[in-house]
Amino acid sequence: MKKAIITKRIVSIFLSSITAFMLPSQAFATNLSDKNIKYSSFDDIQGNGEKAANIVMELEEERTENTKLFLLDDGSKMLAEYTEPIHYKNDNNEWAEYNNTLVAENALYSADYDTDYTNKSSNLNIKLSKKAKPQNMINISDDEYSISWGYENTNKSNIIIDNNDVDLNENDKFTSVENIASQVTYENVYKNVDLQYFVTTTGVKENIILKNSDVQNEFYISYKTKKLTAKQTDDYTITLYNKDNTPVYMINAPYMVDEKGEASSQLKLEILSQNGVNLNIKLTADYDYVHSSNRSYPITIDPELTNKFSSELYLNEVYGNSTLNHGPYYISNDHYIVAKLLKLPELDEGEKIISAKYNFEIKNGSSLFANETNSPIIINAHKLNGIENGVVSYESDILDYDSLSYNDNSKFTFDLTKLTKEWYDNGDKVDGFVIEGLDTAESRIANLKESTRTSATPSITIIYKDYSGTESNLSYHTVSAGYNAQAKVSDYLGNLVVSQKLYEGTGARMPVTILATYNSIKNNDINGCGWYFSFEQCIKETNKNLSNAGYNYIYIDTEGTSHYLKKSSSEEKWLGEDGLGITLSVKEDCIIVENGNTTQTFDTVANGGKILSETDKNGNTVTYSYTNGYLSSITDGSGRIIQLGYTGKPDGSKRINQVTLPDNEKISIYYNSSEIDTISAFVFPDKKTSAFYYDKNNKITKEQLQNRTLENTAVISKHCFIYNEKGQVTKITEYGKNNSEGNYINITYSNDNTTVFEDRNGLKTTYTFDNKGVLMSVLNANGYLESNHSSGLQNTSGADSFTKNILAESYEFSTIGTNKY
């Protein structure tokens, strides 16, 4: 059932080519000096050719008006952004896909009771009559306004519905939205004139097609408008206002275009009469343009009635000394395009881009090549430097390129991962990029496809991964911190991870180790902002969409990292896909997880999925006991018991504040306030203390090893951490007993997947990563690629990635240690 609600009230009728890119209304002159036109060079192509993982499913709950989010089979996610709406809010207030397939129904607006055709599922009710006629031929309505129109003195041409099936494969089957538009044609409504309509997600696009020179150049259109008053704005614009004098619709006639792409703005739109709901308009196309001996037919004039939607990606075409901000858009030996994102898709702090691709479709690809011997058109992408005083300037280096050829001419794609990362690094400041084929187009002109298709494909696909857990395939720089703690900074992400050891049992019969892990990316865990205790590991169910794809369970490990488990095709088990060998099976009253040499038992998901026991291959077992839903004790394989104590919060919940060890010694846990769960200190039985200090974003800026007594608190050592605006650690400094500064290291993160570490002596080491953050190489201060370091550290990547002490292990800084890192 269609919901006749327009969520954005301002609606426009554009007599313009509606391409896949909706643009701002202003235009500006562009004078392109020779020095700013730097022709293509393949000496430094920066694009990335990594193939995307396969799409598992769409995460429907993450939909927006013009985006979809997909889960990939490697655990990453793909955000697909479209240049037109693909979803609307249905009666259940859910984002539903448009289905503009036309179906027949009895006419409500036809005097002769012929059949009307209406779209299936949309927030706009759109009807098209069976025959061309002077009134109520096209009707669009919502809950408040309606507008209909027809052409005077037309032939009664029958509607012809064009079903345009599209062959799709691999990820395109998920990202392409079918039935997004319907196409119909009324042939020969006038002599040598066709009317073509596209029912789209924003309304109706109309083409007046002049098939040869023996045609009229004047058209009379009769509108019926409900609760609206028309006013002539200028020679080519008519605006429709409601009773509050607010513009609701706009009729605009900016240009027309012939088959070769020669455009003209010599169109005139004028009000002839207005009486109540009846509005009569005359559209005049320039006679000389229409009947020129140089004209290539057909000529297309493009009226449109839509609800206003602005894409985040817009284009300007540069040609000669001017820039055009409306279609059609051409790539040739003297036309190129400036593309820019108005707004970057939002990513959370722990999410990192793996890939960013920009997709463009060609309308006239098959006509560009007569046969296979024709040379391809190489289309290049360059970084835009800026537009100043009407002059477009861009880098000569090629970011990426694609080609159009005789056998492959329907689209081109740019991998602009590095450039997109740079935009995110610059605080969402987007300069854009230039698309050109100046060197190879020769006399050919490529025309970007308009958004008048039955299916929609994304213009942008961004693949990213959530790195909020402690990733085993990433490398870290590590320093001993506090008491029995380590602080490590991810070389790729720049987040700070603190691992605080609270207890480590001994013996061979399944001893227990208790860790508290802080991650600066995660600020909302229940036991302290960014903190997670190893005994909090649990099993959770996924949402409905993931479950339908076979991902029924999430295993959250001792460091708070989530592992999605997929159902096996051959047996009733769920398997991890990250190579860690995790296997889950469901029993009547519990869940069993095989994790290496350990078998873990968890409570049912209905009871919280809490861990109940762990058993090693020799049958030794650790048991976990709960009181009123909170873990109260842990018993190791030798029968030693660790007890946990809690303190209440104002909201009635509890948080851990004490760990009682098997010898009855106690570790106290302190928080900064009763409401904000930032752990301020772990105080051990010998009064050695790990103390932590935070900024306003709950990120640790300082840790101290203290010796706390009743009389005073003595600081033994400390480390300070400085962050940039993106939450990445950019400097680590160590201090001794007397607050004397020891070694420090500065860290610089670049959008080209490199990180540079520089110590106080100015020695630099450069780490290079792939797009997934896996370490590929290390270039030392002497300019050599390292496979081993003098510290004995092996430079590896993947599951064998390393940690490394970067600062001298010294509490008395009479010297600066070895200055190695």
Give the predicted meaning of each segment.
Residues 200-210, 314-367, 497:
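A short beta-strand-loop element at or near the start of a globular domain
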Residues 208, 219, 301, 342-344, ...:
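Residue-level detector of buried hydrophobic side-chain packing
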Residues 500, 514, 520-522, 529, ...:
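Extended charged/polar low-complexity repeat regions
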Residues 364-429:
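Beta-strand-rich interaction/scaffold domains
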Residues 1, 5-14, 18, 28-96, ...:
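Intrinsically disordered, low-complexity segments enriched in small residues
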